[in-house]
Amino acid sequence: EEGGAGAKRMVEEGVLDRVPAVDWMFGMHLWPSLPTGRVASRPGPIFASSDKFEVEIQGVGGHAAMPHLTVDPVVAAAAAVTALQTVVARNVGPLESGVVSVTQMSGSDTHNIIPAAAKIGGTIRALKDETMEKLRRRVGEVVRGVATAHGCAAEV
């Protein structure tokens, strides 16, 4: 599933070139809330496209006893996570569908060091290509803006 591109592989292997011609094709996906043995469908999209994002926020590390001598990327990353919660609410219309989920965060691996960089990552999901593009763009803009406001830089 994740990155397997099943439909793409089927097309590359010639499934659409066979005789007799394919009239209908259905993609299927597990749906845990549906009872076993049931198949469900409806007109229009059912599942969203998905993309991942990875962010590195660079600051200046140092000892946690002297945070005033650092530019703390962990604080900037935490602020970015909070700010990203507004991306869908303020950029996706009420009749559209989009999700931005931050699912990863990392920084120092010890208790007394402010790291030079912190990382966050997650997924973006949307039913429409134009919504996906808007969300990708806004995630980058928001993260870079928050990083800059904290004196850091960000790579998205």
Region annotations inferred by a language model:
Residues 91-94, 149, 153:
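Short, polar/charged, Gly/Pro-enriched helix-capping and turn/loop motifs at alpha-helix termini
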Residues 76-79, 134-142:
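A non-catalytic, amphipathic alpha-helix used as a structural packing/dimerization or gating element
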Residues 50, 115-119, 149-152:
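Short gly/pro-enriched beta-turn/loop segments at secondary-structure junctions
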Residues 87-88, 140-150:
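A common structural junction motif
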Residues 111-137:
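A conserved active-site cap/scaffold subdomain adjacent to cofactor or substrate pockets
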Residues 52-56, 119-121, 155:
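Beta-strand secondary-structure signal
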Residues 1, 5, 151-156:
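Short, intrinsically disordered, charge-balanced linker/junction segments flanking boundaries
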Residues 1-115:
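Histidine/acidic-residue-rich, glycine-tolerant segments that coordinate divalent metal ions
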